[in-house]
Every structure is written in C-alpha cells, then in structure tokens.
From Swiss-Prot:
Residues 65-115 form a coiled coil. Keywords: Cell cycle, Cell division, Centromere, Chromosome, Coiled coil, Kinetochore, Meiosis, Mitosis, Nucleus. Component of the Ndc80 complex, which is composed of Ndc80, Nuf2 and Spc25. Its main location: nucleus. This is Kinetochore protein Spc25.
Length: 223
C-alpha cells in the first residue's frame, strides 16, 4: 500500500515537472518570440533612424545650399544697392555738370549775341539769320547826312571769292572787313545752335529786306 502511494506521488511529481517544463518551454518560446519581435522592431527602428539621418543630411545639404544662395543673393543685393547709390551720385554730379554747362552755354550765347549786336551796329550790317549757315544774306547800311545807302548781299557760305570781293567792296566804304567777317562767323555759329532763336533785323534794315542779291556791276556797288 505504501509502495503504491509512493509510485503515485512520484508520478505526480514527474507529471508536475513535465508540466512545469512544458510551461517553461512555452514561456521561453513566448520570450523568444517577444525578443525576436523586439529585435525586428529594433532593426526597423535602426533602419528608420538611418533613413531619418539620411533625410536630415539631405535637408542640411539643401539648407546649406539655400543659405549659400541667400548669402549670394544678399551680397548681390548689397552690391546692387551700392551700385545704384553710386549711379545716383554720378547722376547728381552729371546733373550739376549739365547745369553748369547750360549756364556756360547761356553765358556764351549771350556774349555771342551781344557781340553780334555790337558788330551789327558797328558795321551797319544786318544779317538774315534764317538763311545761315548755307547762305550769307543781309544788307549793310551806309549812313549819310542826306540819305542812307543800302548794300544788299546774298552769297553762298562756301563762296570764298565772292565773300572776299564783298569785303573789299565794303572796305571802300570804310567798313571794317575784319569786324564784318567776325559778325558773319558769330552769326553762323549761332545759326548752327538748334536752341538759338534768330534775331530780328533792326528797323533800319526793313527797307532792304526785299533786296536779296548784290549787283557788283552797279555804280554804287562797284569795287
């Protein structure tokens, strides 16, 4: 009887050990499964970290490129601003120079007009400024006690011989040929200036306005 009890107890112990081993194996299998899953998750995580680092690297590279572009753009804008400022300053200087040149031009024009007026009165010669610079056209008035004598002329500006002959003819009436040539030269200079307004011949020359040619064969015009 005692022997049967011992065998039954032994069998229970063996079965208990077997069941315990089965449970341990099942637990071990579960642990192994969890470890395998953990390792798989860890591997996925590592791969995700690697991909993340790659993306971060790309982002950093793009950021560096963009920063470089922004820096270049900022430098370009700064250079452009400096160039615009320099251009503005140059324009201001040029504007002042143009103003000064305009002032000098007006002064020169006024001086020339004053000289023309003086020479015109001195020589008694009044030019048709509309005919210049192609032609030298006008009239010289000889003042006399009884009546004024008009010597009209109309020559091409390139007619050197004709102009020289006219000067010699005028010298015969005590007209200063140098002053007469200077008058023609200054009047021609004024006519070539597009901003010059032709001067109006004085009232004394109105009578000779319709006479446009000199007759070198006439008694009063003979050299």
């Amino acid at each position: 009887m005692a022997k049967a009890v011992d065998e039954s107890t032994y069998e229970q112990r063996v079965r208990a050990l077997y069941d315990k081993q089965i449970r341990m194996e099942a637990r071990e299998a579960g642990v192994i499964k969890k470890i395998s899953k953990f390792n798989s998750n860890l591997l996925d995580l590592k791969e995700a970290v690697v991909r993340h680092h790659q993306k971060v690297g790309k982002v950093r590279k793009v950021k560096m490129l963009r920063c470089g572009e922004l820096e270049k753009r900022a430098n370009f804008m700064e250079e452009l601003t400096q160039e615009l400022e320099a251009t503005k300053q140059r324009n201001l200087v040029m504007r002042d120079q143009i103003k000064q040149l305009n002032v000098l031009a007006r002064q020169h024009r006024n001086e020339v007009m004053e000289s023309i007026h003086t020479l015109s009165k001195t020589t008694g010669t009044y030019l048709n400024h509309e005919a210049l610079p192609a032609r030298v056209k006008g009239v010289t008035v000889l003042r006399n006690d009884n009546s004024d004598q008009l010597i009209p002329f109309d020559l091409k500006a390139t007619d050197v011989e004709g102009l020289e002959s006219l000067c010699q003819h005028l010298q015969g009436f005590n007209i200063d040929a140098f002053q007469w040539r200077q008058l023609v030269s200054l009047a021609t200079e004024m006519s070539m200036d597009s901003h010059t307004t032709p001067t109006t011949p004085p009232k004394e020359a109105a009578e000779g306005k319709s006479i446009i040619e000199i007759d070198l064969t006439s008694p009063t015009s003979h050299i």
